[in-house]
UniProtKB/Swiss-Prot annotation:
Localization terms from the record: Cytoplasm, Nucleoid
Coiled coil: none
Chief location bin: cytoplasm
Protein's UniProt name: Recombination-associated protein RdgC
GO molecular function, one term: double-stranded DNA binding
Chain's gene name: rdgC
Source organism of this protein record: Xanthomonas oryzae pv. oryzae (strain KACC10331 / KXO85)
UniProt GO cellular component terms: bacterial nucleoid; cytoplasm
Highest taxon of source: Bacteria
Keywords assigned by UniProt, alphabetized: Cytoplasm, DNA recombination
Similarity field: Belongs to the RdgC family.
Length: 301
């Protein structure tokens, strides 16, 4: 259940989530209809075993999951059938259908194919820290994150969540760290980075499995390149890649964090899940608070 990517948003800590269990059932995921392309709504964080449980809260952490059902209708299939229809009409009437007629034919084909199309299911998990006013979405896609915000907004009626905003340029901070400026306590460099020439269309350099403080990196910095992605390690607990878009990718929970699970005395699947949720939430909070200070992240109040 550990998140692998984090797209973060801020929201006011004054928001009231006390009625969330009442508000979610009306916006629960409904099966995609025969003539619908997709459906979105909340599902149980625990999967099919507890379908009626649409949220999970432990202290100040709230776990929500947005589910989706999407019809798979390959464009190549539609276009192939459309060309056959067009060819039949051309042979029968001696002329090719107009653009408007082709569009109508295509719409009719989609309408005909939708009820027979395969359905792909998906889920996107999110953790809300109600004390510090941020939401961490398990996705590296800003669009996926915004979709989750939209679903929460639909449930609450209002949800003024905003993407993270740094009061200092993230590139400048990341470049400074790789150039030798002191990192926040507990943070160290990993072995991966991406550097770009600031001019439009400039060179891009990607380094992996490499010592990031050395002559080769220094030459790129001297040439004016700026760091846009940087691998970092938080103590022995987390490793991740931080981008200048403030998205956290390749998040991995290390032994320093996972060892805490071995000391848990609770038994049972739910107890184990709660232990993992508690651990993950606490580590993400620690990371967020560190980045909040280092990057001067704006609040949403």
């Amino acid at each position: 259940m550990f998140f692998r990517n984090l797209t973060l948003f801020r929201f006011p800590t004054t928001l009231d989530f006390s009625q969330i269990d009442t508000l979610l059932p009306p916006v629960q995921l409904k099966p995609v209809g025969p003539l619908e392309m997709s459906s979105r709504g909340f599902i149980s964080p625990f999967g099919r075993d507890e379908q009626g449980v649409l949220s999970h809260r432990l202290e100040d952490f709230l776990w929500l999951t947005v589910g989706g059902e999407d019809k798979i209708l390959p464009g190549a299939v539609v276009n192939d059938l459309l060309e056959r229809k067009v060819a039949e009409i051309e042979e029968k009437e001696g002329r090719r259908p107009s653009g408007k007629a082709r569009k109508r034919l295509k719409d009719d084909l989609i309408h005909e194919l939708l009820p027979r199309a395969f359905v792909k299911s998906s889920r996107t998990d999110a953790i809300l820290d109600l004390q510090h006013g941020y939401i961490a979405v398990n996705s590296s896609s800003r669009k996926s994150g915004e979709n989750v915000m939209s679903e929460i907004r639909g449930a609450l009626g209002s949800f003024p969540a905003l993407p993270l905003n740094a009061e200092v340029a993230p590139r400048a901070i990341l470049t400074g760290w790789i150039a030798g400026e002191p990192l926040p306590e507990g943070l160290s460099l990993g072995e991966e980075c991406e550097m770009k020439d600031p001019i439009e269309g400039g060179a891009v350099v990607k380094c992996q499995h490499q010592e990031l403080r050395g002559d080769e990196i220094d030459k790129h910095l001297e040439a004016g390149k700026q760091v846009t992605k940087l691998a970092l390690v938080l103590d022995d607990n987390l490793s991740f890649v931080l981008g200048d878009d403030l998205v956290i990718r390749k998040l991995k929970f290390l032994d320093g964090a996972l060892d805490q699970l071995e000391h848990s005395e609770d038994d049972g699947a739910r107890a184990e899940l709660d232990a993992r949720f508690t651990l993950m939430s606490a580590e993400i909070r620690r990371l967020f608070l560190l980045l909040e200070t280092a990057l001067k992240l704006s609040k949403a109040e």
